[in-house]
A protein has these predicted regions:
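Short, low-complexity, polar/charged sequence segments that are solvent-exposed and flexible
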Residues: 45-48, 59-63, 80-83
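Acidic-leaning, charged glycine-interspersed low-complexity segments
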Residues: 82-131
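Oligomerization/assembly interface segments of phage tail-like spikes and tubes
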Residues: 53-71, 112-125
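Charge-dense, low-complexity intrinsically disordered segments
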Residues: 3-7, 65, 110
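Small/polar-rich, solvent-exposed N-terminal microdomains that initiate assembly or binding
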Residues: 1-51, 85-93, 130
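Surface-exposed beta-strand edges and their flanking turn/coil or helix-capping segments
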Residues: 40-42, 54-57, 74-76, 111-112, ...
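Mid-chain, well-packed structural core segment of small domains
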Residues: 67-88
Length: 131
């Protein structure tokens, strides 16, 4: 049986979403010190092994913009791209992706920006281990 370990899903999503949408900057934690409108923060918040070869990853996605309308627009684009990842040719093989509806979520770390947040779950193969 081939053993696998989880991948760095924050980096995988950051890389793949940035390749699909160049109008935003995508980050994994920590929050960048120069956070600005158009930034998207992707943070793993949980997950589980779903088979001998695949893992499920729960992530939180924060979309920052200058105002509420722009934050909604940005989160709609990122949400749509994320759930479409299994249908796209990306650096990571996603077998499933779903997400809940984005919601307004004030961030005290960035009071000058509006933020929309959504949770998502993606499933993809792990990294093969050689033992």
């Amino acid at each position: 049986m081939q053993l696998v370990s989880p991948i760095d899903i924050e980096d995988a999503l950051r890389t793949d979403l940035a390749a699909l949408y160049s109008d935003a900057r995508f980050f994994a934690p920590p929050i960048p010190p120069d956070l600005k409108a158009g930034d998207v923060l992707i943070e793993r918040v949980g997950g589980a092994r779903v088979s001998g070869a695949s893992h499920e990853y729960d992530v939180s996605v924060d979309c920052y913009a200058a105002n509420d309308a722009a934050a909604v627009a940005l989160s709609d684009v990122v949400h749509g791209l994320l759930v479409s990842l299994p249908l796209r040719d990306t650096s990571t093989q996603y077998s499933a992706a779903n997400a809940n509806t984005p919601y307004s979520n004030y961030d005290p770390r960035a009071p000058q920006l509006a933020r929309q947040t959504f949770r998502a779950t993606v499933i993809c193969p792990g990294t093969r281990l050689t033992i």
